[in-house]
Design a protein with these regions (language model features):
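Active-site segments of SGNH/GDSL-like serine hydrolases
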Residues: 147-158, 177-209
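Alpha-helical scaffolding within the catalytic cores
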Residues: 128-137, 172-177, 209-210
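N-terminal secretory targeting modules
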Residues: 1-60, 64-87, 139-142, 263-273
Length: 273
């Protein structure tokens, strides 16, 4: 007779069960790790977005910049650098020496432009306003770039008296002007030379161009020779052989702007600090 021996309970393989449970858990953890690694750099990039770095620009000129040419130039500078970074001054009848502090104050009688982040004044009628001094403008606005549109009014002086002594005097004025425009900072300077004129002789126009070009070589600044991109046709371009009508002024400004874009890095994008 057989003794009743209870049947041995089936043995559970816990190691196989653990392996079965750990596999999906490991897969989930791996996916989480991959997502974290991929997302981390993009999060870092979002924390440092590209920030526009704008140059501060000061532009000064004569009656040509009081008129339409000045409108177009200012619109371009504001669209490129922002209104808070642009200051434009123009005084009808002025020459480089009139903007220098040691020289007597020049009062314009035919037009004035002053457009800054704080105010906007454009007057083309007869008045009696003092031309500001470039030393004060540089100290106030601290420009990175100074754009100059001056020189046409020297042609009157050279028409009546063009001597080596006179040209030496004007060369000295150029050097003083550039030194004042730079101040103590590494300011970039661009000189827009006078456009073509049917009133002044080619000799006088070339003399002014040569004075500015020689100063550019000595003092290391950029120039735009406007005579190469303009042609004054009496009755079409203007009436007096010197001043350009609105249409001609705008066309001249557009051609100048094309050259400015090739010459000056007025605005760029950089990784913010």
């Amino acid at each position: 007779m057989k003794t009743n021996i209870p049947a041995r309970a089936a043995r559970i393989d816990w190691s196989a069960l653990a392996r079965a449970l750990l596999k999906p858990l490991a897969l989930v953890l791996a996916l989480v790790l991959v997502v974290f690694v991929v997302a981390a750099p993009s999060e870092k990039k979002r924390s440092a977005p590209a920030v526009p770095m704008m140059n501060k620009v000061l532009m000064i000129g004569d009656s040509l910049s009081v008129a339409k040419f000045g409108d177009v130039m200012r619109d371009f500078l504001v669209s490129t650098c922002g209104a808070r970074n642009v200051a434009v001054f123009a005084s009808c009848g002025s020459s480089p020496e009139n903007w220098l502090r040691p020289e007597p104050t020049f009062f314009t009688k035919c037009g004035y432009r002053e457009q800054t982040p704080a105010r906007s004044v454009v007057l083309d009628r007869r008045l009696h306003l003092a031309t500001p001094k470039i030393e004060s403008l540089v100290a106030t606005y601290r420009p990175d770039t100074v754009i100059v549109q001056l020189g046409t009014n020297w042609m009157d002086r050279l028409t009546t008296s063009d001597t080596p002594q006179k040209e030496a005097e004007l060369s000295d004025i150029m050097d003083r002007f550039i030194a004042a425009a730079r101040g103590r900072r590494a300011v970039q300077i661009l000189w827009i030379m006078p456009p073509d004129s049917s009133h002044f002789s080619k000799r006088v126009q070339s003399t002014v161009e040569n004075l500015i070009s020689a100063a550019a070589q000595r003092d290391r600044f950029e120039t735009i020779p406007s005579r190469r991109i303009t042609h004054y046709v009496p009755g079409k371009t203007g009436r007096d052989g010197v001043h350009y009508n609105p249409e001609a002024s705008e066309e001249w400004a557009k051609r100048v702007i094309v050259r400015i874009k090739r010459t000056l890095p007025l605005s760029e994008i950089y990784a913010g600090q």
